[in-house]
Regions:
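Basic- and aromatic-enriched surface patches that contact anionic nucleotides/nucleic acids
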Residues: 1-133
């Protein structure tokens, strides 16, 4: 059964219950898009829907990438699920889910995302400024 909270979903990604169909394109978002997604989430803005397919049939899939390194080509290991495994395949929302997974549980180019949610406006920057370090 899918857990519909953010961290429940991220844990299911980490535990290989929510996976990407083999035909999905690679992750392409840059760190500014990831930061803007997190900023929207923190401000309570809608960030779009995710479409999952709960399949009991054998499917070819790949796991989410937790640590993104844009300096090397992305290489994927394609796996096959057993019939009845009940995997959830992401049909729409891969870029957003990967971004959330990287932001909260992984790294982007060997850096961890930090969000400045306590300071006020400084140098024309929006409060809640974000950066990778």
């Amino acid at each position: 059964m899918i857990e519909y909270t953010l961290f429940g979903l991220l844990n299911q990604i980490e535990n290989n219950q929510v996976v990407l169909p083999a035909m999905q394109r690679p992750f392409v978002w840059k760190e500014d898009r990831i930061s803007r997604l997190i900023d929207s989430l923190l401000r309570g803005f809608p960030i779009g829907a995710v479409m999952l397919w709960n399949t009991k049939t054998a499917q070819r899939y790949r796991r989410f990438t937790r640590d993104i390194d844009t300096t090397v080509p992305q290489v994927f290991t394609i796996e096959s699920s057993e019939p009845g495994a009940g995997k959830y395949l992401v049909l729409d929302g891969q870029q957003r889910l990967t971004s959330l997974y990287v932001a909260f549980k992984g790294t982007y180019n060997h850096r961890t995302l930090y969000l400045d949610v306590l300071s006020g406006d400084s140098n024309g920057k929006d409060p809640g400024g974000e950066y990778f370090e």
